[in-house]
């Protein structure tokens, strides 16, 4: 019987080939698993996106639903109350009090912005009246500036007149009016309605931010409004 003996070199070659085949098989299996994992990930992601899209469409459909009756019936649904309810929901979505409870700096900035807006509104109204009557507004500006400073508002003094650094329009009114105007543009054609919606926006904003003044040294917006009105009345009563 002939005995076949493999040389060490041939054995090593066969062993290397076997090892390479195993490595390729392992790599192939690993690649297949990776591809399958990626595929499953995209399937899951696509499913989630689809669910979100459907949810968003349902929400949007509910929010913009009108009765499918006559044209006059559809118009009857769109009233001032619908617009005001939308503005109130927009304010709730902004979540001023929620943000303020988590961020003291935001709460402080909100209080300052609200009081500065009250200051600006009263200043402009009274100054316009005094100027129309030919009355010097400098004493009035000095007095309401001092009131703003005493209220704790930051600002600068120039020519003996203190001006709050955040003086300007109420920063929360614009988002409410703009969003409502975009959704219901037909309701904002009339200037009287525009003014009415702005007054409503100011009202619900003041109600929303009122609790932020409960535990601070600043006066509430209503108290500050009264202080400025009393100052303005001193000058207005002397107008001819």
UniProtKB/Swiss-Prot annotation:
Signal peptide: none
Transmembrane segments: none
GO molecular function per UniProt: GTPase activator activity; guanyl-nucleotide exchange factor activity
Keyword Secreted recorded: yes
Keywords recorded for this protein, A-Z: GTPase activation, Guanine-nucleotide releasing factor, Secreted, Virulence
A Gene Ontology biological process term: actin cytoskeleton organization
InterPro entries documented for this protein: SopE (IPR005414), SopE-like_GEF_dom_sf (IPR035949), SopE_GEF_dom (IPR016019), SopE_N_dom (IPR016018)
Subcellular localization: Secreted
Region of interest (GEF catalytic domain), residue spans: 78-240
Pfam families tied to this protein: SecIII_SopE_N, SopE_GEF
Record carries keyword Secreted: yes
Family the entry assigns: Belongs to the GEF (guanine exchange factor) SopE family.
Role description: Activator for both CDC42 and RAC1 by directly engaging these Rho GTPases and acting as potent guanine nucleotide exchange factor (GEF). This activation results in actin cytoskeleton rearrangements and stimulates membrane ruffling, promoting bacterial entry into non-phagocytic cells.
Additional detail: Encoded within a lambda-like prophage region with similarity to GIFSY phages.
Record-given protein name: Guanine nucleotide exchange factor SopE
The gene coding this protein: sopE
